[in-house]
A protein has these predicted regions:
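Glycine-rich, Lys/Arg-enriched anion-binding loops that position phosphate/diphosphate groups
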Residues: 140-233
Length: 318
């Protein structure tokens, strides 16, 4: 039996969701099934949850936008932008599928799967509780400080960076079994993860310095235009550490897959959240959560990405 699990790629919550979901399916008697993992993204060159991916006897989509399909047998998500249109939401509701779960009040998809597994299926695995807890911290940015959020001295935070950089199909196929059978701390401290992190550490340091150089303070917003060179990744919390009094950040850069805008709310600013970032990003074809979101553009749309980023920064500046 083939079970295809399409989850959010290059994302610690996406990876952790795949681990929890696989463990839940094992508990439901499918331990002998072949699990095939697909890492989905929203960048121009990243795979989507298309029909061509849903080729299993069972198919799941996790931590990613809903896809109406008779082939889809399981669905878990917590993003407010899970449904690209009202038609998609209507299809979700009309399906009345007891294995479709959506709850935007959850701060991570991993926690949604863990709680649903316990309430609906009587499933819990104490060995995976550290993974659930940390995935929830990362996806909700519930760190004690912005400095902690960008500190990479903790092996688990180094693992987060590795997942965000390398998290494709092959990486998920390797890491999901590892995290199913080994403690999170052991996987994070493994030589394989350390070797993958080595080049990322220097890149992270350079990224912090470039953010410092390129940042513009626009009232309560920090705007960063980094489109002059190719970025390896877009860090979510660097501006909050560099500008602790900022309330929002808008960063635009060019990744391998094309331009991307990252928008976020600084939870350590001491100021209330007064905008729905997911709704703002959705207006431009992106999505996310009330406190963080992103928008991807085609490779030749750099100038439009820069224009949109400035529009959003102006809106959030009030």
């Amino acid at each position: 039996m083939l079970f295809v699990v399409a989850s959010h790629g290059h994302c610690f919550d996406g990876l952790s969701s795949a681990v929890l979901f696989t463990r839940l399916m094992h508990e439901r008697g499918l331990s002998q099934a072949k699990f095939e993992y697909k890492a989905c993204g929203y960048g121009m060159n990243q795979q989507r949850n298309d029909e061509k991916l849903l080729v299993g006897d069972e198919n799941a989509i996790l931590d990613y936008r809903f896809k109406s399909s008779p082939k889809l047998t399981w669905y878990f998500d917590h993003h407010r932008t899970a449904f690209p249109s009202e038609t998609d939401r209507a299809a979700f509701e009309a399906a009345h599928n007891p294995h479709y779960f959506f709850d935007a009040t959850y701060s991570s998809c991993t926690k949604l799967i863990a709680d649903t597994g316990k309430k609906r299926f009587g499933f819990s695995d104490p060995n995976l509780e550290p993974l659930v807890r940390f995935a929830d911290i990362v996806d909700s940015a519930r760190f004690d400080s912005p400095e902690q959020a960008i500190d990479r001295s903790d092996p688990i935070m180094r693992l987060v960076s590795v997942v965000e950089h390398y998290g494709d199909d092959g990486f998920y196929a390797q890491l999901v079994p590892d995290l199913l059978h080994k403690p999170l701390a052991e996987v994070a401290a493994s030589s394989a993860i350390n070797e993958r992190y080595k080049p990322l550490g220097k890149k992270h340091e350079r990224f912090v310095e470039r953010v410092r150089e390129k940042s513009e303070v626009q009232g309560r917003v920090v705007f960063v235009d980094m489109t002059d060179t190719l970025l390896e990744s877009v860090g979510k919390f660097v501006t909050y550490a560099l500008f602790p009094e900022s309330v929002y950040s808008v960063l635009v850069g060019v990744l391998k897959g094309g331009p991307k805008i990252s928008v976020g709310y600084n939870p350590w600013s001491g100021q209330p959240l007064d905008a729905d970032i997911s709704a703002i990003c959705a207006r431009y074809g992106g999505g996310g959560h009330p406190v963080v979101g992103g928008i991807s553009f085609a490779a030749n749309d750099v100038e439009r990405a820069r224009l949109v980023a400035r529009e959003i920064a102006k809106e959030l500046a009030g």
